Every structure is written in structure tokens, then in C-alpha cells.
């Protein structure tokens, strides 16, 4: 591997298909209010990470990035949410 991918790289390759458009009620990239509501309900950024690891509704585990590390996913969530 080429080392850790940045949050931007992960978002662009794996997250944007749904989170870029709000497909299937996914919180949109940059919609900090929608992300904050979810983060507050789930225990912050770590809670959102835990949800992403297990999958949620239409989102598969790790949101299609099966080989992403927890740190890469957390960076991507941070980029999308602004949290």
C-alpha cells in the first residue's frame, strides 16, 4: 500500500456517491447541522465512526471502503461533517 489515504481521498473515492447528493437520506457533505444531529445522538465523531464500521440503513459496513482503516474513515467523516 501507499500509506494512509487522506480524508479527502476517501470521501472522493468511496463516500461522495451517496453523501455528495444526499442519496437515500445520507447526510450531505458540508451539511454540518445534519451531521451534528447524528453525532449528538451517537456520541460524537467516535459514535459516527462506530456506525460507519457496522453499516447503517443503506450504507454497507465501512461505506464501501472495505480496506479503509478506522483512522482513514474517521478522517473522511471529519471532512464530510466539519466536526
Curated annotation (Swiss-Prot):
Keywords for this protein: Disulfide bond, Electron transport, Heme, Iron, Metal-binding, Transport
Source organism, top-level taxon: Bacteria
Pfam families: Cytochrome_CBB3
Disulfide pairings: 65-68
A GO term for molecular function: electron transfer activity
Residues that bind heme c: 15, 18-19, 59
Post-translational modification: Binds 1 heme c group covalently per subunit.
Protein family (similarity comment): Belongs to the cytochrome c family.
Subunit structure: Homodimer.
Function per UniProt: It is unreactive with cytochrome c reductase or oxidase.
PANTHER family assigned to the protein according to its UniProt record, in alphabetical order: CYTOCHROME C5 (PTHR40942:SF4), PTHR40942
Protein name per Swiss-Prot or TrEMBL: Cytochrome c5
Amino acid at each position: 500500500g501507499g500509506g494512509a489515504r487522506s480524508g479527502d481521498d476517501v470521501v472522493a473515492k468511496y463516500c461522495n456517491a451517496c453523501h455528495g447528493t444526499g442519496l437515500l437520506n445520507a447526510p450531505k457533505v458540508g451539511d454540518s447541522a445534519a451531521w451534528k444531529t447524528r453525532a449528538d445522538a451517537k456520541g460524537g465523531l467516535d459514535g459516527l465512526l462506530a456506525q460507519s464500521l457496522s453499516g447503517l440503513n443503506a450504507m454497507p459496513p465501512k461505506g464501501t471502503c472495505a480496506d479503509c482503516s478506522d483512522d482513514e474513515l474517521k478522517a473522511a467523516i471529519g471532512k464530510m461533517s466539519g466536526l
